[in-house]
Amino acid sequence: MKKTIALLTAACLLLSGCQLNSQKSEPGAATDSVISSMDSLDDGANAAAPDQGATLGYDWTQNDDKSAGSDASQVPVPEMDAADDQTLFTFSQMSLINNELAETAPDDNYRTTYEVFVYSFADSDGDGIGDLNGLYDNLGYINDGQPSSGMDLSAGEIWLMPIFPSPTYHKYDTTNYMDVDPAYGTLEDFDKLLKECHARGINVILDLALNHTSTEHPWFLAAKDYLEKLPAGKDPVKDECPYVWYYTFSREQYPGFVPMDDTWYYEARFWEGMPDLNLSTPEVRNELSTIMKFWLDRGVDGFRLDAVTSYYTDNPDGNMEFMRWVADTVHGINPKAYLVAEAWTDQSSYASYYSTGVNSFFDFAYSGADGIIAQTARGNMSAKSFAESLANEENLYSSVNEHFINAPFYTNHDMPRSAGYYADDDGPRTKLAGALNLLMTGNAFVYYGEELGMMGSGKDPNYRAPMYWISEDECDAAGAGDEAGTGAKIEADTKAAEAKAEADSKAAETKTEADTKTTEAKVEADSKAAGSETRAEVKMVEQEMSDMMCDGPAEMDNFAMKFGSAYSQISDEYSIFNYYRNAIRIRNSFPVIARGRTVVDYDRTNDSVAAFTRKDSDGKYEPVEIFINSTSEPASVDITGSDLRELKAVLTVSSDKVMLDGTTLTLPAFGICVMGEAK
């Protein structure tokens, strides 16, 4: 389904009866007029079109030209007939301003990473289980390889949750660290995916659970078989079966140990199907070194280290020593490899782990329903406190390692989905929270479906629901097999097209009867041709998106989603998806956002508005000042005296606009803007 997303957006445009001129406007030509006269745009469906030369925020056409200098997103607004008072487009301020941005993120480890649970992402073979080819077919949704195309999320890295063979759906208990689970595909499928990711500038990191294996791993099976055959009272001999020392066995049941048989117990802190590895055994470390080299030599860009506080039970020093060993091993193979670790503990503890050489640690203080991000979005934490927290944590981490790369995230596979955090929210707080994450320094992480506002709470399988490509109603429409399958969408747009045809006919009454008949005949022919083509394309999109939907974990509950599917959100200018897309575009366009340091602007910060600058120490990147209104009411600040007074980018949760009137900056409810140096 390589072209489904492109077809979807193209089809949506066709349904509106619109066609775009293929000419390019001069980049930046309309920016000044757009910013200065934004208040003149009508927010309604019949808004007046911007001046010729302003640009759309989407590439509505399939553009396979990837040659240097190609920029499919710079599509001018079609010229409108002066007599035609019906405008075909509604423009958001985000599209009009952010479309001018050039995504210039450097090739380093400060990225935006998209977490993918392959099992639930996209199915390519119809078995209901996501697979690597399903991900390959849908890379264009994550990153289409065309900067500023305006159709993809533009994520620069993918974190693959475990892909190794495993008896469980989540695959954190592997039976072979150097292969791909057959349900997901083959090593060749992985190589194909990795090659395409790299061609698009996407890094790929693998989830690596070094703490434990499956009880079905050959190492454990060999140890189990040996111990079960060992005569009563005899101690195991390492030369006879070294795999016994790969784990921790005992004839006594200590805390955290589970029975293997009537005589032996083994350590399994997570659950009985995950026996803990003895990471102090040199042979185990040799095995793990071989595993990491296998994947790094294959081209993998790094690893996500699972549960690093559990390497050694109640032994923080042992955990840190092992993290140092992993970092030294990985960076000895590839100095540019990226490591991010899960240390689900308090902030001061995981801050201290930056001394180990691991590049990043997930910033749990900001995540989840009770984290700083959600508390700020709810209004339980002031904007000022949020800004101060950013500066304070950066100072904390840099005091341990000045080269730290923070790993902020809002949600992940072990947490309830974020759309359920705000019971009365119809989108604004969900959007704001996403931006708070994506405007933090470091390598920001987004969990698949978060950009759609997916739901899922109660138990782990619910957090890992199928990617919401298309709703059940849309699936049913795809399976209907007739014209009604396109539903009200086509019906409504057909009526609109007929109404416009009638209006065009009346406008032509002053012409000769022959001309009128010719015009009517052409309108009718064009309408029928466009309608047939549109129906075919929309039905193909619906069917393909329906086919790639996954079943999800068997233990998952049935529950409804709160917001629209990818199918509906991609073409919705004000959707959560397009808000995230704009936030990532801003992050990519101003490298200092991820790589700079936060300094609170106390002259302009208050409980409603967070104002802080981002600058890097060596002045390599253009500095910016970020303003965030965390409240549900408009808020104004005076930027008199600021060197960063040019409006560069905006994030708005609705059609309300960021306004700059002289030195007064007004942010709408939950509005955000980026200010920079005047050119």
Task: Identify what each model region corresponds to.
Residues 660-679:
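C-terminal beta-strand-rich structural cap/linker in extracellular carbohydrate-active enzymes
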Residues 15-17:
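C-terminal motif of bacterial Sec signal peptides marking the signal peptidase cleavage site
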Residues 215-216, 221-222, 226-250, 327-328, ...:
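Conserved alpha/beta catalytic core and glycan-binding cleft of carbohydrate-active enzymes
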Residues 19-45:
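Short, low-complexity, disordered segments immediately C-terminal to signal peptides
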Residues 91, 391, 403, 409-412, ...:
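Loop/helix patches that line or flank the sugar-binding groove of alpha-linked glycan CAZymes
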Residues 634-655:
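Beta-strand-rich binding/interaction modules
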